[in-house]
Each structure stands twice: as structure tokens, then as C-alpha cells.
Regions:
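Residue-level recognition of hydrophobic positions within alpha-helical transmembrane segments
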Residues: 38-40, 138, 156
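Hydrophobic beta-strand core residues of beta-sandwich domains
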Residues: 64, 70-72, 126
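Short beta-strand His + acidic residue motifs that chelate non-heme Fe in jelly-roll/DSBH
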Residues: 55-56, 72, 78-85
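A hydrophobic/aromatic-rich effector-binding and dimerization subdomain
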Residues: 2-21, 25, 81-141, 167
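Generic protein-terminus/edge-of-domain signal
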Residues: 1-68, 108-110, 120
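Short, Lys/Arg-enriched, Trp-marked, Pro/Gly-tolerant hinge/linker segments that flank
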Residues: 120-128, 143-157, 163-179
Length: 179
């Protein structure tokens, strides 16, 4: 893999509900490596179930273990590659349109626009015990079942996950931001 990065356009099934979910994604030793790191506007949440992956986020490199959750921030160059075992994980990609509110609303000003503009970046490796895993598991279930009003449930779970990240100081500020 070279040091160049390539823009990755993320397709969504429904443009009105811009979330993409890849459940039980598998990467094997035979999966071809990407030519370059990629980036996109969407926030990406990776939840690892088995095996291990080599995750690159910007200049940081990680080797995953089952149960871990990783965040790829908007516009962050990244890659996920096979490292060992039977690698199975879920990938959630949420476009900024899914979590934006009204332009002058307090949550939009204090959090959502700050995330999109990279003034707030989440730590890539997230504690995988307890609440974050429960939120992601529920989000995956709601999206898969697609019961009435599932869009509201999924959106609320994404916001709940961001609230957990923000409340537990799972962020790294890229610039000084006053709220």
C-alpha cells in the first residue's frame, strides 16, 4: 500500500436515509489489499466479532481483538486489512445528513457540526464493554429488522452513541472550541 489516499464514494440504498450497514463482513488472507488508504465524509463505526484486523486511521495503526469498536472520523484516511483468524465484523457508515438537526439548534452547534468540520474527532479505539456495545448491537438489530419507525430508532441510537462518546471524553479536539 502506498501513501496516497483515494476518495471513496459511499453508496446508500435510500438517499433520504443515508446510513449503510454491512453486517458480518468478512476479510480473508486472500482478500486483495487496497492500493491506497481511502477517505469519505461519513463517520464509520466498526464492531469486530472474531479474528483480528489491522486498522489504520490516519497515522495510527491498531490490531483488533473480538469485541472492540473502532471509529473512523469523517475525512480520515483509513484502511482495514486482514491480520489473523476468521475475521468477521460489522461496518456502519452514517452520512452527516442522518445526524444533523436544525442549523441553529444547540446540539447541532455544540456537537454535530463540530464533528463534521473535524473540530471534534472521536478516538479511534473505543471501550467495547457495556454501553457502547449495547447501543451498536441494538442499532444493528433495528436496522436489520426494519420494523415500523426503524429509521427513528436507528437515528436515535446513532445520536445516543455520539452522546456516550462525548460524555465519556472519547474525543480528541483538533482545535480549541468554545461551547
Amino acid at each position: 500500500m502506498n501513501s496516497d489516499s483515494v476518495y471513496e464514494e459511499i453508496p446508500f440504498e435510500d438517499a433520504m436515509f443515508p446510513i449503510r450497514l454491512l453486517q458480518n463482513k468478512r476479510i480473508t488472507p486472500d482478500t486483495p489489499e487496497k492500493e491506497a488508504l481511502t477517505w469519505h465524509e461519513q463517520i464509520e463505526i466498526l464492531y469486530f466479532h472474531s479474528g483480528s484486523a489491522a486498522v489504520t486511521c490516519g497515522t495510527r495503526k491498531y490490531v483488533t481483538v473480538p469485541g472492540e469498536i473502532y471509529i473512523i472520523n469523517p475525512y480520515e484516511i483509513h484502511d482495514v486489512a486482514y491480520y489473523g483468524g476468521t475475521l468477521v465484523f460489522d461496518c456502519i457508515m452514517a452520512d452527516p445528513r442522518i445526524y444533523h438537526g436544525a442549523q441553529d439548534e444547540v446540539c447541532e452547534i455544540k456537537y454535530m457540526s463540530q464533528i463534521e468540520n473535524r473540530k471534534i474527532c472521536f478516538n479511534n479505539k473505543i471501550s467495547s464493554s457495556g454501553e457502547p456495545a449495547a447501543i451498536i448491537t441494538e442499532l444493528l438489530k433495528e436496522y436489520q429488522q426494519k420494523q415500523p419507525a426503524y429509521e427513528l430508532k436507528v437515528k436515535s441510537l446513532i445520536l445516543n452513541f455520539f452522546a456516550w462518546l462525548s460524555a465519556t471524553k472519547s474525543t480528541r479536539s483538533t482545535r480549541k472550541t468554545k461551547f
